[in-house]
Curated annotation (Swiss-Prot):
Predominant cellular place of this UniProt entry's protein: nucleus
Source species of the chain: Homo sapiens
Key words of the record: Acetylation, Cytoplasm, Membrane, Nucleus, Phosphoprotein, Transmembrane, Transmembrane helix
Lineage: Eukaryota, Metazoa, Chordata, Craniata, Vertebrata
Protein name (Swiss-Prot/TrEMBL): Integrator complex subunit 5
Spans traversing the lipid bilayer: 534-554, 856-876, 930-950
Length: 1019
């Protein structure tokens, strides 16, 4: 009978059935009848065919009474559960399908969940098996767990895809779990297995876990819902036991000693041609049967129990290192742990992502690296190479924040000991060399992946191109481009070479995003030519792969600058490096010349974005922008008016700011920029000259050129007004019907307030005289460069002095008039009679006061006078200043002119300027040489003669003719009636005769030239 019940090779009976409250024990005759009924399916007494329900209960009776019949009974019960599942699915098929499973209506109440007549049988089976497990778990739990788990696998595979209510296993794990747990039969099997595992969890759960792994391998992926449910119920046990069973099976199938990726000795006979495979060359399911199941189970649990999986994997790793060196001796499981973990990580990106976050912390202690090195010493060279290849592949698949940390760890470990920055990191040389080799192989592997992302060359020719292959390691580094660039610029040996190469690969992989960003970081952080050369090398390596790299980098950096995300020191460094590159190109340097040329083109296309940087509040940024724009090539087409005016305004502002902060040595860049802008077009020249003159005469800049600044003028006026009890000006305004005009007497005599005395004295700020001279010379030098005629210096008599353009000088003259006396701008150039000065007293006083407060006006008049006939356009200023001086000398009661030093100097300068500008003949133009020797009334007489001459011979441009030999306009006074002086020269001679004792030697200077002399001067 035992032979009939137990299959060949089956284990012996686990023992007598437990005592229950069911039927009394059967006699031998009754037991024989039950066996016959079970085997034939016919009732031995009544002779009719047993129903499925009766047949199942007959088997349960035998299972209680005859333990050796368990194999046959359990096999028969498979059919019972199969019929119950079929009935359940048939009932679901009859129900209308509406929406997803969790929204579908329940089956009709008249249809039992387990099929007609089988629900109670399934419940009885669960009760019987539960009693067996509780009575003798060590004997029954392994058998029943294997039976239940295998039956669930068969049912899952059998009915997958055969019914419309059973979703496909791929991507429908939650729906499958809900469907099968809603079936009474499969839920009962799950409860039975959970009871078995609970009974053995404290002693030896390996049998249950082995059965789970075997079934998972055989019926995956239809069986995944079982694994997910059991793993969620027993995460700690399942994770540890699944890994333990997988490791044991890995050892049996060649893992211990076979290394990572070899099966016994087969790997050495057929080596893989690709040293860095995307997946193992031989399918892992064929080499190690259970490892695929381990990967699947842990993959399901990784989302909710990632911490437990990570702790268990790291525990296995540390335990293997603590067991001593690897190789052919020692515990096989310890020897195979590292290859096993590598293989798991290769097959499951989810597991790799789970561990990669703490992998660096796990390997950082020097003792761990030393133990790992000792552990791997006993492995053959071929197996070590295989594991190294797997490690390279795993690093390339690392993702998330752990990828950058892993890279830093590898680089720090591979660096020579003298350059390691981490304190206390003592790494053996063998470990250092291994990391060095790992990094080199990693870079080679990444290069292959990046440059072969689209598959084989012929792939996609006839159809759509294949999607690019993803490289998780490079994807994770996209957010660390700035850190990589900073590490590269440290120029530590080996490190910067590795990271520079990695930046190139990352730029090609993520094009076009990371390439411009990396180039921008290098340009904004490089502090020396050596560091700057890294940017040129990166560009040289990417120029073939990335088109438009430099314009993109330039635009991205400018966008960061204007958005305020690039700090001012980095902005200044970026602009200085650009200027250096463009300068190299203009000097014809080798190497980065092409880079400088391209950057020059990019900069010229963004002049409107660079111009505001000249106004940057940070001085170093503004100065760097000026250095770049000073040598940046302008576009081939003409600048638009808006671009030109924006550049000129910013350049002029930069000039005065540099002059204030750094003095003349700091304005070189601004001067060069403004000179180039003045040469772009006539409009540019006029704008530069106009803004320079206006800026120099502005109240905020007058003190740079020796001007007087009313520091507290407004404050003092307010105080004075508040203290005054009576104001003559206010009184007159109240008693007049209208506000007095600019020519009235009320606006002339305002030296003080009646009852309060004179106005408070002005608070004057002044600079050092030498500094004023330097500043003035810098401004005049810039104006001369801008006004210089294209021909340069062609006259030997000019002693190298540049020939100024009359049109440019005219622009300066017009700007002077508009700045000093705006209400007289555009006035007639003809000189009015002396009586006319009575109507312009206020204007003349204002002009005289401006000349006294701003000595720069005299220098600007000299500049204008050097390019006749431009001084004619300053006629209003000359009349006003001359009238103011006449009034002063008329009112002066001093015996000599030395008591009025400023007026004396102003008178001399005025006459000399008019002579230089050919407004006076030479005889009259030399009279200023004797002013210091005369009395004030005599100076007034001479100035009146000047006024009279100008009244008769007005300063009109039409009186000048162009002399091609000298390349300038001249005025021939001999052709004008009385142009040599005439009666006006007689006044000068009379003064000379009166002071012949002191001025006799000057008489030759005031003689009208002969016609022959004029002829020689004309030629």
């Amino acid at each position: 009978m035992s032979a009939l019940c137990d299959p060949p090779g089956a284990p012996g009976p686990p023992g007598p059935a437990p005592a229950t409250h069911g039927p009394a024990p059967l006699s031998a005759q009754e037991l024989s009848q039950e066996i016959k009924a079970f085997l034939t399916g016919v009732d031995p007494i009544l002779g009719h065919q047993l129903s499925a329900r009766e047949h199942a209960r007959c088997g349960l009776l035998l299972l209680r009474s005859l333990p050796p019949a368990r194999a046959a009974v359990l096999d028969h019960l498979r059919g019972v559960f199969d019929e119950s599942v079929r009935a359940h699915l048939a009932a679901l098929d009859e129900t209308p399908v509406a929406g997803p499973p969790h929204l579908r209506p329940p089956p009709p109440s008249h249809v039992p969940a387990g099929g007609p007549g089988l629900e109670d049988v399934v419940q009885e089976v669960q009760q019987v098996l539960s009693e067996f497990i509780r009575a003798n778990p060590k004997a029954w739990a392994p058998v029943i767990s294997a039976w239940s788990i295998d039956l669930m696998g068969q049912l899952s595979s059998t009915y997958s895809g055969q019914h419309q209510r059973v979703p496909h296993a791929t991507g429908a794990l939650n729906e499958l779990l809900q469907l099968w747990m809603g079936c009474r039969a499969t839920r009962t099997l799950m409860d039975i297995y959970v009871q078995c595992l609970s009974a053995l969890i404290g002693s030896c759960p390996d049998a249950c876990v082995d059965a789970l792994l075997d079934t998972s391998v055989q019926h995956s992926p239809h069986f995944d819902w079982v694994v997910a449910h059991i793993g969620s119920s027993f995460p700690g046990t399942i994770i540890s036991r699944v890994l333990s069973c997988g490791l044991k099976d890995f050892c049996v199938h060649g893992g211990a000693g076979g290394g990572a990726g070899s099966s016994g000795g087969s790997s050495s006979q057929t080596p893989s041609t690709d040293p860095f495979p995307g997946s193992p060359a031989i399918p892992a399911e064929k080499r190690v049967p259970k490892i695929a199941s381990v990967v699947g189970i842990l993959g399901h649990l990784a989302s909710r129990h990632g911490d437990s999986i990570r702790r268990e994997l790291l525990r296995m790793f540390h335990d293997s290192l603590a067991g001593g060196s690897g190789g052919r001796s020692g515990d096989p499981s310890l020897q195979a742990t590292v290859p096993f973990l590598l293989q798991l990580a290769v097959m499951s990106p989810a597991l790799l992502g789970t561990v990669s976050g703490e992998l660096v912390d796990c390997l950082k202690p020097p003792a761990v690296l030393s133990q790992l090195q000792q552990h791997l010493q006993g492995f053959p060279r071929e197996e070590l190479d295989n594991m190294l290849n797997l490690a390279v592949h795993l690093v390339s698949q690392a993702s998330g924040a752990g990828a950058y940390r892993l890279l830093q760890f590898l680089v720090d470990t591979a660096m020579p000991a003298s350059v390691i920055t981490t304190q206390g990191l003592a790494v053996p040389d063998t470990v250092r060399e291994a990391c060095d080799r790992l990094i080199q192989l990693l870079l080679l592997h990444l290069q292959k992946l990046v440059h072969h992302r689209g598959g084989s060359p012929g792939e996609g020719v006839l159809g759509p191109p294949p999607p690019p292959r993803l490289v998780p390691f490079l994807d994770a580094l996209k957010n660390h481009v700035g850190e990589l660039c900073g590490e590269t610029l440290r120029l530590e040996r080996k490190r910067f070479l590795w990271q520079h190469q990695l930046l190139g690969l990352l730029s090609v992989y993520t094009r076009p995003s990371c390439g411009p960003e990396a180039l921008g970081h290098l340009l904004s952080r490089a502090r020396s030519p050596e560091e700057l050369s890294l940017a040129t090398q990166l560009y040289a390596g990417l120029v073939v792969s990335l088109s438009g790299l430099l314009p993109l980098a330039f635009r991205s950096c400018l966008a960061r600058v204007h958005a305020g995300t690039l700090q001012p020191p980095f902005t200044a460094r970026f602009l200085r490096n650009l200027a250096l590159l463009v300068g190299w190109e203009q000097q014809g340097g080798e190497g980065p010349a092409a880079l400088g040329a391209h950057f020059g083109e990019s900069a010229s296309a963004h002049l409107s974005d660079l111009a505001p940087l000249l106004l940057h509040p940070e001085e170093e940024v503004a100065e760097a922008a000026a250095s770049l724009l000073a040598i940046c090539p302008f576009p081939s087409e003409a600048l638009s008016p808006s671009q030109l005016l924006g550049l000129v305004r910013a350049g002029v502002h930069r000039f005065f700011a540099s002059l204030r902060l750094h003095g003349p040595p700091g304005v070189a860049s601004a001067c060069q920029l403004l000179t180039r802008l003045s040469q772009t077009s006539p409009a540019g020249l006029k704008a530069v000259l106009q803004l320079l003159v206006e800026g120099a005469l502005h109240r905020g800049n007058t003190e740079l050129f020796g001007g007087q600044v009313d520091g507290d003028n407004e404050t003092l006026s307010v105080v004075s007004a508040s203290l005054a009890s009576a104001s003559l000006l206010d009184t007159n305004r109240r008693h007049t019907a209208a506000v007095p005009g600019p020519g009235g007497i009320w606006s002339v005599f305002h030296a003080g307030v009646i009852g309060r005395g004179l106005k408070p004295p002005k608070f004057v700020q002044s600079r050092n005289q030498q500094e004023v001279i330097y500043n003035t010379q810098s401004l005049l030098s810039l104006l001369v460069h801008c006004c210089s005629a294209p021909g340069g210096t062609e006259c030997g008599e000019c002693w190298g002095a540049p020939i100024l353009s009359p049109e440019a000088a005219k622009a300066v003259a017009v700007t002077l008039v508009e700045s000093v006396c705006p209400d007289a701008a555009g006035a007639e150039l003809a000189w009015p009679p002396e009586e006319h000065a009575r109507a312009t007293v206020e204007r003349d006083l204002r002009i005289g006061r401006r000349f006294r407060e701003q000595p720069l006006l005299f220098e600007l008049l000299k500049l204008v006078a050097a390019a006749p006939p431009a001084l004619c356009y300053c006629s209003v200023l000359l009349r006003g200043l001359l009238a103011a001086l006449l009034g002063h000398w008329e009112a002066s009661r001093h015996p000599d002119t030395t008591h009025s030093p400023w007026h004396l100097e102003a008178s001399c300068t005025l006459v000399a300027v008019m002579a230089e500008g050919s407004l006076l003949p030479p005889a009259l133009g030399n009279m200023h040489e004797v002013f210091s020797q005369l009395a004030p009334f005599e100076v007034r007489l001479l100035l009146l003669s000047v006024w009279g001459f100008l009244r008769e011979h007005g300063p009109l441009p039409q009186k000048f003719i162009f002399q091609s030999e000298r390349g300038r306009f001249i005025r021939d006074f001999s052709r004008e009636g009385g142009g040599e002086g005439g009666p006006h020269l007689a006044v000068l001679h009379s003064v000379l005769h009166r002071n012949i004792d002191r001025l006799g030697l000057f008489s030759g200077r005031f003689q009208a030239p002969s016609p022959s002399t004029l002829l020689r001067q004309g030629t």
